[in-house]
Structure formats: C-alpha cells, structure tokens
C-alpha cells in the first residue's frame, strides 16, 4: 500500500483505560508513513480469552487460487506455504466448506474453489501438517448455501424425505471417514451453513431438525470427540436466535455449538451479538462461536469483479484501513469471549481470497476463474443456480477484506490473532 496510513502511538499508562474502538483517544502523537508494519498495530488485549480459544480462518478457495498462479509469502517477503504463515500468525483452526458435487454434467466446476470432499482433504492435510485443527463445513448443496438459498444437491432432488435423510447421514459419515483416513485432524463439523431459513431444500423446521439429527448422528458414530455445530445468521433480527434455539430444543436436535455469522457492516452491534449468543448458551447449555467474520482494509477492488463491501447503505463502524480491520477482528473476538466459558472462538472468512491477477487484466482473470474455479462463481454454475451465479458469476468479491495484500503478502492485520492474546502497543520509529 502506497497511500499514507495514520499510525497511533499509545502510551502504556493509558493502556487499560482505552477501548479498542476508541484507540484514537490514547494517541500520544500521530505520524504519517508510507506503509503500516505489524509492529505499528494497536491491539488491546482481549480479556477472558483462554488458551484454547479458536482463532480460525476459512481458506477454502486456496487450492483454486494456487492453481490459478497465486503465490503467498511470509512476513519476510519469502514464498511460504500459506498454512505455515497462518500458524505463525496465531491461527489454530482451519475451516473448509464442502459441497456435494460442484460440477456440471461435463465436469466443469461451479467455482468458489470447486470445494468437494477431495479439496477438503487437500486443505485439511495441509492444515493438520501445520498443527491446526479442521472444521468441516458441510453445505449439503452443490454450491453456495446461505440465507437466500439452500438448494438440494442434484443427486438428491427427486428423493423422498426419508430417502434424503438416509443420504445425508450416509454422505456425512462416508466423507468424514475419508478425511480421517487421510490423516485430517477434524475437531468440529458444521451440519449445514447459515441454515437460518432452510436446509438441504427443506424450509419446514420439523423436517430441518430431522436432517440436522441425521448429520449429527453420522458425526457421533464416526468420532464422539468431534464437536457438532449448527450455523445461523442475522443475529441483529430481534428474537431470531431465541426462536431457533427453542425450536432446536423442542425437536431434540443433538448438537454442541450454536454458531453465528457476524459481519460488522450487516449484522448489528457487538453488544447484541454477545447478548443473543450468551442467552443461547445460558438457556440451553450450548457452546457458541462466530463461524464467519471479516472486514475491509481498502475500498479498492483488486481483480475487476465488484466487492460486497463497502456499499452504499452499509454501516461501517471502523475505518477502512489495516488498523481498522485489525480492530474489527479483535472486537469480534472480545464479543465471543464476553459470553463466558461457552465462547469457543472466531473464524475469519476467506482471508486469502485475493486477485488471481490485476484488474487491468480482467479478461485473463476471467479465463482463470472459469478454468480453476478461483472466482466466487463460474458461468458453469448457471445450470444449478441460474438466478444468482448464472447472472453475476465472476471473481473474488472479498479481495479487499483479505488479510493478505493483492500480491499475496500478509497484511499487518493478520497478526491480530496472536496480538489479541496479550495486547500490542506500537513502538515509535
């Protein structure tokens, strides 16, 4: 980054008094520099963060990016396996999404990393080799499952509900067995992704709960030590999480972790996030966590495909800068830690989904996105998701929210995972 960045130098005497979002109040002096360094970050210590607190990253797109020619570096500017770089920065858990069959009838990938079980194994083995546990995130769809769509896998489309239950159980168990056989250290399994209003093509909560239990049963039978997580979103909507948690309880759904997405520009205040997660934990005895979060460090687009943030109408509670990004991540960690012992941790979503090439070479980028699935969706996804991917396919929509710059070098904000444990005051230079 060549633009000038403000650096804040906080005196130790005011360390305990300043809030993370109010770090400007602790300024001793201000200095303009050409580039922010990791040692220049101000990160207030997160109180209540135990040694097992999850500091996770979802890097599901990484294989497709590397196949597209993307190279990642360490903090010294040397080429290095990104999983080693993440580990050195304090990341201790890797999340990977799994789609049933993200390919068309000719074998062309839908994009978004083309994340099938085999990709999950590749990613999982590299994470395990670097001493990180793995969260297997089953979407139970052939492409993106989120609040707007929970499309049933093509192969399950004509099944009866009872047959679908059997297939979900079988698919989950067989996939986990494959991953474990390959040496992947799975610590947690997500049965569904952002299943706020649907799951595997079902929208009736009674049926959804039965499907949740089939996935959970498969996990329990595979390894009883693996945590079962259910994942929802929109914590800002009044009464949503209390309704979901109560419904799960009434339907006797077997799970360990109530997980939420939390994006600062969409999902309300951190105080509310803590409140709704704490209520679930205290009322139903569940562990809680944030399964997805991220924030912008620049308003610039890197690859010629538009980004999800910033957009008009969004609330951006932190500066759009490397320091603002680090503070945003730190504050989400604090929000989860503030739920008490039930708070497991936080996963950053796609911190490495950077451009496959500069936006000035967008035509070349398009070829790479189509060939390797390194964009959020390829044109081939139109047969499965014609209304969304079929119209808006293209590159990375979050390259300006990555924790690596557009050329694959780690941003100083990547160090927030380790700085949050003890806090960090920048040194003058």
Swiss-Prot record:
Signal peptide: 1-21
Temperature dependence: Optimum temperature is 50 degrees Celsius with AZCL galactan as substrate.
Active site: 194 (proton donor), 292 (nucleophile)
Keyword entries, A-Z: Calcium, Glycosidase, Hydrolase, Metal-binding, Secreted, Signal
Enzyme class, UniProt record, top EC level: hydrolase
EC number: 3.2.1.-, 3.2.1.89
Annotated residues for binding of Ca(2+): 301, 303, 305, 307, 396, 399
Principal subcellular localization: secreted
Keyword Protein biosynthesis: no
GO molecular function, one term: metal ion binding
Cofactor(s) recorded in Swiss-Prot or TrEMBL: Ca(2+)
Cellular-component GO terms for this entry: extracellular region
InterPro entries: Glyco_hydro_53, Glycoside_hydrolase_SF
The keyword Kinase appears for this protein: no
Positions contributing to substrate binding: 146-149, 233-234, 267, 296, 311, 388
GO BP, one annotated term: pectin catabolic process
Role of this protein: Involved in galactan degradation. Degrades arabinose-free galactan to galactooligosaccharides, producing galactotetraose as the main product along with galactotriose, galactobiose, and galactose. Is also able to degrade galactotetraose, galactotriose and galactobiose, suggesting an additional exo-mode of activity. May hydrolyze the beta-1,4-galactan linkages of the galactan portion of arabinogalactan type I, a pectic plant polysaccharide from which most of the arabinose has been removed.
UniProt family annotation: Belongs to the glycosyl hydrolase 53 family.
PANTHER family the UniProt entry points to: ARABINOGALACTAN ENDO-BETA-1,4-GALACTANASE A, ENDO-BETA-1,4-GALACTANASE
Name of the protein in question: Endo-beta-1,4-galactanase
């Amino acid at each position: 980054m060549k633009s000038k960045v403000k650096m804040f130098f906080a005196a130790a005497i005011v360390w305990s008094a300043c809030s993370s979002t109010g770090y400007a109040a602790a300024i001793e002096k201000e200095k303009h520099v050409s580039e922010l360094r990791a040692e220049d970050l101000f990160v207030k210590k997160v109180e209540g963060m135990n040694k097992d607190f999850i500091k996770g990253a979802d890097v599901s797109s990484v294989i497709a990016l590397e196949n597209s020619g993307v190279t990642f570096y360490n903090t010294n500017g040397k080429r290095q396996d990104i999983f080693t770089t993440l580990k050195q920065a304090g990341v201790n858990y890797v999340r990977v999404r799994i789609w049933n069959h993200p390919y068309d009838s000719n074998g062309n990938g839908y994009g978004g990393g083309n994340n099938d079980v085999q990709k999950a194994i590749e990613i999982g083995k590299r994470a395990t080799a670097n001493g990180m546990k793995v969260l297997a995130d089953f979407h139970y769809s052939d492409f993106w499952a989120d609040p707007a769509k929970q499309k049933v896998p093509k192969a399950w489309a004509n099944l009866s509900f009872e047959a679908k239950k059997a297939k979900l159980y079988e698919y989950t168990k067989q996939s986990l067995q494959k991953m474990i056989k390959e040496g992947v250290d799975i610590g947690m399994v997500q049965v569904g992704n952002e299943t706020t209003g649907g799951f595997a093509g079902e929208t009736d909560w009674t049926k959804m709960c039965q499907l949740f239990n089939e996935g959970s049963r498969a996990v329990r039978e595979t390894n009883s030590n693996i945590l079962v997580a259910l994942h929802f979103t929109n914590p800002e909507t009044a009464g949503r999480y209390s309704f979901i948690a109560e419904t799960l309880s009434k339907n006797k759904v077997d799970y360990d972790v109530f997980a939420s997405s939390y994006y600062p520009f969409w999902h309300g205040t951190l105080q509310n996030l803590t409140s709704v997660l704490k209520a679930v934990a205290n009322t139903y005895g569940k562990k809680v966590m944030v399964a997805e979060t991220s924030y912008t460090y620049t308003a610039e687009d890197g690859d010629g495909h538009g980004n999800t943030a910033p957009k008009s109408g969004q609330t951006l509670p932190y500066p759009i800068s490397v320091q603002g990004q680090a503070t945003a991540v730190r504050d989400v960690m604090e929000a989860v830690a503030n739920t008490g012992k039930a708070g497991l941790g936080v996963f950053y979503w796609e911190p490495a989904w950077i451009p496959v090439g500069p936006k000035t070479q967008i035509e070349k980028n398009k070829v790479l996105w189509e060939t390797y699935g390194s964009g959020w969706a390829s044109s081939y996804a139109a047969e499965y998701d014609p209304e969304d991917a079929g119209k808006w396919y293209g590159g990375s929509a979050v390259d300006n929210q990555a924790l690596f710059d557009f050329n694959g070098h780690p941003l100083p904000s990547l160090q927030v995972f380790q700085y949050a444990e003890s806090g960090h005051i920048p040194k003058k230079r």
